[in-house]
Amino acid sequence: MAISTMLGSISCCPSPKGYEMVKQHSVRLKHCVFTVKSSVPVYSEGVNDGIKLHSFGNLVKKKVFLDTSKRFYFQGRWSESSGRRVETYAGVDVASAVDVINDLGFDTLTFLMVTVIIVPAFRILKASPILGFFFAGVVLNQFGLIRNLTDVKVLSEWGILFLLFEMGLELSLARLKALAKFAFGMGLTQVLLCTAAFTAFELPPNGAIGTKILEFLFHSRPDLVNIRSIDEAVVIGAALSLSSSAFVLQLLAEKGELPTRFGSATLGILLLQDIAVVPLLVILPVLESQDIGGESIWPMLAKESAKALGGLGILSLGGKFFLRRIFEVVAETRSSEAFVALCLLTVAGTSLVTQWLGFSDTLGAFLAGALLAETNFRTQIEADIRPFRGLLLGLFFVTTGTSIDMEVLFREWPNVLSLLGGLIVIKTLIITAIGPRVGLTIQESVRVGFLLSQGGEFAFVVFSLANRLGVLPNELNKLLIIVVVLSMALTPYLNQLGRKAADFLDERLDPGEKIGEDVNFDVSESIVIIGFGQMGQVLANFLSTPLVSDSDLVGWPYIGFDLNPAVVKESRKLGFPILYGDGSRPSVLQSAGVSSPKAIMIMYKGKKRTTEAVQRLRLAFPGSPIYARAQDLPHLLELKKAGATDAILENAETSLQLGSKLLTGFGVMSDDVSFLSKVFRDSMEIQAQEEITASETNAGLKPMQMKASDINVVSAATQKQVQLMKPMQMKASDSNSDSAAEILQETAGLSQPPEIDDSSVNIDNGFVGKADKAQD
């Protein structure tokens, strides 16, 4: 087995793992002989027992042998021009691969133990587990519990790749086009303005404004954060303009806000920032090079960017035509192992290709997800990668916490806090100012500004490269990394602060002036529809028909509210009475003239947003019925507890409607189909009430069994219906003689329903309660 080691790691002090201390036998030797040269000595075990030594600098005499303890010994003589001689011996222990594996195994066990403790604890505290992982990284690093940090960091970066891949899977082509507006209209402007602002703050060189402020406030050393050149200022400014995709996207996913316009704007900006890393990585070597003289860097930058964009386009087209076909072929084998392996290969392969093109690997992972977003395999792919994504992303947050140099933090904490505050304030103000120009409300702009005001993980890449090329001094590099890491840790709190600021602005602004005066009827007791998307418009049309009201009016009077200006504008063109504003806030409803709504229909899709709206409106209007959309049974129970009068399991009603059409197509009478649908809906409400009473949130379905005993005379249509519904077992053993007559009456179209066993009713989906009449 070939064995190699870098002797440059050896120093005349306690050595790293796997090496002994260099032994000096002469006080006349000023430096360790084996680290004077930058060349890397390499040992390799040959065919025989002999060992060859390469690139060993100025050694005149070389002698190497291998003993039975698998330890390399070497002896060298170094002759100086003065004729002095020194002789040095060193022993190097070869770190075996087993040691590396053991270290990774120990680190893995440590991380899994931390995950088991942190995630439940922070869920109980109702805090984001991201913070728990971050502080765990700080603690583990301080106590030296992570043995192989370099390899762990490499492994943790896969978590970001899986996160971006999953985000790509959630995007359709239409949503990608919508994101382009935010990416280029808002993201590009944000990167340019933030870079310019931070650069101006760091100029002029050797006397920057920021340096003078820190000296005045905290008496900091002039050389601590002093900028030496314009190039250095541009690099720092551009790196600080980036935000953290990993922290922000994970937070939005936890809150269920990715599908919202606020989430789309945030995602669009983050995608543009990923693309912006490319010119940064191209410019840095150019800035460091001393050979370009007065030549412009723009031709080189344009050339590299064009090459990268062309390669990205080829990758997109190739993936569109070949990637889907590959998944089809593997899926036909029905091998779960091969399918999971293909998912991992797709993420890794596209990431490597985009890295080779000059883009970030995360952009490649996102692109792969977007290419598979509209295939039939999306659901299975998400299910397969979710465990990998969750654990590896947690590992990334742990390794982020290990990046803090605690010695520098404690020594320079006033400067750290000042730089941290300046970073958050400048980015928040710039992003908030840009938002309304691309169609966001001031409230949404404030939220996006706070959420993206932290630094990003790509700043580590830029700072590291700049430091390695000599563009950024080491002390300033450590300080900036601390600032970026702390800002990333504050992301959950920045999100909460942005939400509170948006709420404050929403209450301070006069909603009556915002939403206009286009409603020409009394809305004080009208039905309120909150969220006027497609479902809201269908409901509005349903309420407008004369058949739903026995008065002289054309249907029931209603008023709609929506925060999307485009939706409001288009709906008004179609004649809908809709106002601009957040209808989930009582102050907005009261300003619009709604004092005692006849009913409130909440058409939001997000779970958390819907529940919060129900809670606020129930407190403000205790006598008004409130109806809402539930995503699943636990959400329905949560809405009921929050004060909703009734709720709809929207996905289940679709299943019931499709099932009804299926049975009708099989020839089942429409009355029988309607009866069956009613049984399901009523049984769902019964179990929901039982779940609420028992305070349970079990989303599973109980097997539904209908009992009908001693049926001696049943119509032909009923017999046919029973034959078609094999999953519903009809029992005829446990009922009295009246049951047959009741079933016969219902089959003949009478109103008396049959008895059903409440304890065995299957309820997963469908309308609950009185909302079954409001079909979407």
Swiss-Prot record:
Q: Which GO terms describe its biological process?
A: calcium-mediated signaling; chloroplast organization; nonphotochemical quenching; photosynthetic acclimation; positive regulation of photosynthesis; potassium ion transport; proton transmembrane transport; regulation of cellular hyperosmotic salinity response
Domain (RCK N-terminal) ranges: 524-649
Q: How is its activity regulated?
A: Regulated by a mechanism involving lumenal C-terminus region; a fine-tuned balance between photoprotective energy dissipation in high light and a maximum quantum yield in low light involves a reduced activity under high light.
The record ties this protein, via Pfam families, to: Na_H_Exchanger (PF00999), TrkA_N (PF02254)
Q: What is its main location?
A: plastid
Where would you find the membrane-spanning parts of this chain?
94-114, 116-136, 154-174, 182-202, 233-253, 267-287, 297-317, 339-359, 390-410, 416-436, 446-466, 469-489, 527-547
Q: Which reaction does it catalyse?
A: K(+)(in) + H(+)(out) = K(+)(out) + H(+)(in)
Q: What happens when the gene is disrupted?
A: No visible phenotype. Impaired rapid hyperosmotic-induced Ca(2+) responses in kea3. Altered non-photochemical quenching (NPQ) and photosystem II (PSII) quantum efficiency after transitions from high to low light leading to a reduced growth rate. Transiently increased NPQ upon transition from dark to low light. Slightly faster NPQ induction on transition from low to high light. Delayed NPQ relax on transition from high to low light. In contrast to dpgr, the mutant kea3 has a high-NPQ phenotype during steady state in ambient air.
* Name of the molecule in the record: K(+) efflux antiporter 3, chloroplastic
In the bilayer, the protein is annotated as:
Multi-pass membrane protein
Gene designation per UniProt? KEA3
On the Stromal side, which residues?
115, 175-181, 254-266, 318-338, 411-415, 467-468, 548-776
The induction text for this entry reads: Up-regulated by low K(+) stress.
- Tell me the organism: Arabidopsis thaliana (Mouse-ear cress)
The organelle transit peptide extends over 1-72
- Keyword Transmembrane (UniProt): yes
Fetch the PROSITE patterns from UniProt: RCK_N
Question: Which superkingdom heads the taxonomic lineage of this protein's source?
Answer: Eukaryota
- Has UniProt tagged this entry with the keyword Cell division? no
